[in-house]
Amino acid sequence: MRKVGVGFDYYGNVVIVGDIVKARFKLDNPWKVIEIYMIDINTYNYHLGKGTEDIWINYKEVEFVSHDDGSCILANWI
C-alpha cells in the first residue's frame, strides 16, 4: 500500500467528498479527505474525517475524491 495523496489540492484548499460519492455511500457533510493510499491498480483506500469521526473506504475509481465542481481529483502526489 502506497500513499498517493493527502487532503489538500494544489492551491491548499481542503479536499471535500463530492456529491456523487456522498450519495453512493450515504455520507453527509462535511466529510473531508485525510489521506489516500493505492492498494492495487485502480483501487484506492480513502481515509475520510468529519469532526472526531473517521472512516476508511476502498474504491476503484480515482474520481472518488473531488470538489463538487470536479476541480480536484488526487492532489499532492507523494
Predicted regions mapped to residue ranges:
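Intrinsically disordered, low-complexity, charged/polar segments
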Residues: 1, 50-78
